[in-house]
Amino acid sequence: MNLFAEIEPKPQDAISGLTLIESFISEDEESKLIKNIDNQLWLNDLKRRVQHYGYKYDYKARGITEDFKVGDIPQFITPISERLLRESSFTKLPDQVIVNEYLPGQGISSHIDCVPCFEETIASLSLCSDCVIDFTNPYINQKVSILLPKRSLFFLKGEARYNWQHGIASRKTDKIDGQII
């Protein structure tokens, strides 16, 4: 008897170094986090609203310097930072956080996060709605689309961090298996 016969591989299994944790935070934690985020100042420098904590990333220069220090990471983010340290490959508390707001129809071009700017593990927490993110590896000409359920967290390290671009297509709705989500 094969116990694994009915277990289908998940799309993220195709990408070494990508870990997806569904329901990383509770609905209550999400609600409190959104309320705190919405009470902070948003920047409108890009086609989307953004908040920077710790250090401000310079999108034009693709860099961060000590001059871009914008203060400490707020207390409302501390519980998530501490969980990252306990439950992931992070070896120290994050010192930089970027909050991106993507409205329907907005997205972000496919990219690899700036290598000298950010450390070996990147984490992303999805809030408010499900979203499809596309991963592309130009070295092997492969594309993998993954559903990020709201309140899920994904980590990129190793091959996923350095060889796979990730982006969100600018579309009003996402489809999974022909169904609009």
Please report, for each region that a protein language model flagged, where it lies by residue.
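Non-heme Fe(II) oxygenase metal-center motifs and adjacent flexible, charged/small-residue loops
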Residues: M1-I181
